[in-house]
Amino acid sequence: MAVPHFSVSIVARGSGRSAVLSAAYRHCAKMEFEREARTIDYTRKQGLLHEEFVIPADAPEWVCSMIADRSVAGASEAFWNKVETFEKRSDAQLAKDVTIALPLELTAEQNIALMRDFVAGHITAQGMVADWVYHDAPGNPHVHLMTTLRPLTEDGFGSKKIALLGPDGKPVRNDAGKLVYQLWAGSTEDFNAFRDGWFACQNKHLALAGVIADRLAVRAE
């Protein structure tokens, strides 16, 4: 089995990153970066085995229309350009970037099924877009996954922060009576649950493939 790896970073302008540039690199594609009026071309990059751009089942009409009749890379280009246009700040956070090592014991088809299962249960089910690519580097099959930091709304994008709800479904207030907010896309405290969700999903698919039981206790360091 490959060394377990599951890391999350933020694509942020403040660190010199761009969602469109990141998407073009991962999709090995040529994309127009509308905000800077320039073309990004990674078509000579190799290693792309599979790519998908997945939206939530209840995604707004504008998202459905945007990606209709587009290639996967084309849908990615259109969506991340819209994110780049929406975010005005010079230090804006644009996307969550996840890198995942895939198990060597699974075939490419089985790893794709594994990713689809994880995306359905942990990304799109949370209302997030999942833009993912499968790179088949020798001895290191892995996935790059970009997800949204804001909820999708009928008019575009919502707030990154939402009111924290208590067990009774009502908004939580602090001692001063003010609403308590949380990040819609999850905080650093939610990372362990997100990561563990991946390894649980991976373990399930390893078991389905008949991998011996002692391989199923893999966890990230």
Regions found by a protein language model. Give the residues of each.
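N-terminal nicking endonuclease/strand-transfer module with a His-rich metal-binding environment
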Residues: 1-221
